[in-house]
Amino acid sequence: MTGTAVTPSRAEFIELAKLHTVVPVWTQILADLETPVAAFIKLVGEGDGFLLESVEHGERWSRYSFVGRNPRGTLTLRNGVLTVTGDVPASVPLDKGMLAAMEELLRIYRAPLFPDLPPLQGGLMGHLGYDVVREIEDLPNVPRDDRDL
């Protein structure tokens, strides 16, 4: 381990929090004997989480691994109905589609960028399936979702 110093300091955090609704807090840990998947299992366990790997310039190995756990809230759009699990701000519209909800979340959660950190420093995680295009374009219905995806 390279140290247990946490960045930013408490004083820096307080100043950053005056301008931003979310402030990344981090420390560096030497993990030469850990794989990203092993770290994910140890950090997330049986709960909800994600593991993202970065690849730069077509390299085979990733430069960064991003692990997230215990989402504060989730949004799910199924059959045109947007549902919320967990804690999502009241100003997030649930009757205007996924894109409007995400736009409001991005407006609310503003974080500073730290040049010494990897490009992904937190924020919204998830995926948008192809069908979200129906919020922009009028397309015919697709076959029934028999796999509950």
Where are these regions (language model features)?
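Signature of the chorismate-utilizing enzyme
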Residues: 1-149
